Amino acid sequence: MRTEAEAAGQPLEPGDFVQLPVPIIQQLYHWDCGLACSRMVLRYLGQLDDGEFENALQELQLTRSIWTIDLAYLMRHFGVRHRFCTQTLGVDKGYKNQSFYRKHFDTEETRVNQLFAQAKACKVQVEKCTVSVQDIQVHLAQGHVAIVLVNSGVLHCDLCSSPVKYCCFTPSGHRCFCRTPDYQGHFIVLRGYNRATGCIFYNNPAYADRMCSTSISNFEEARTSYGTDEDILFVYLDS
């Protein structure tokens, strides 16, 4: 029986605790965290075939420079329902002087802007909007997942007590990555939350053997840092 809220088309309040069984897949290199996150999501959806995945990378001409829009195109390639939310529809020219983006900025600017321009025609769902923690919790409560771009220099895992064996950047203490003043982009997969303790559960592709957890305040700081464009790729279970 449908509730009045469902009948009215209103979203139901999420549960107090969600922890989705998203498999952990470790990145192989310093640059492929986004691809590792995509593999996790596709495996969670039951759609990961290694051969098909490699063929998709070739067809989409993905290189070592992976942007969130690339991951959205990858989801579209596999017929996965998605919604890419960002604050910038294209490349922010202000990033040209940031060390993280500087090396390949000119060539990447043209490529990435073209992907944004062609998104609608290619049926890649892109939207310029602000996403709240409540929006994310509602999404996760329905069994869906999300790939989020964060500043790894800010992200802090409350569960990690040992250094990262392999990651994009040098670890320090309990942090998934060392805290540096410069932006360091990194993708993670959201898999749940605990409203009572105010934490977010996620998979960090730097690890092969654990789920990570951080406070909502730290997660918000990491995902809204300058350089992320607040990019979040919502992926739907009913794909």
Swiss-Prot record:
Lineage: superkingdom: Eukaryota
Coiled coil (residue ranges): none
Bridged cysteine pairs (disulfide): none
Descriptive protein name: Protein GUCD1
Source organism of the structure: Mus musculus
Lineage: Eukaryota, Metazoa, Chordata, Craniata, Vertebrata
Gene: Gucd1
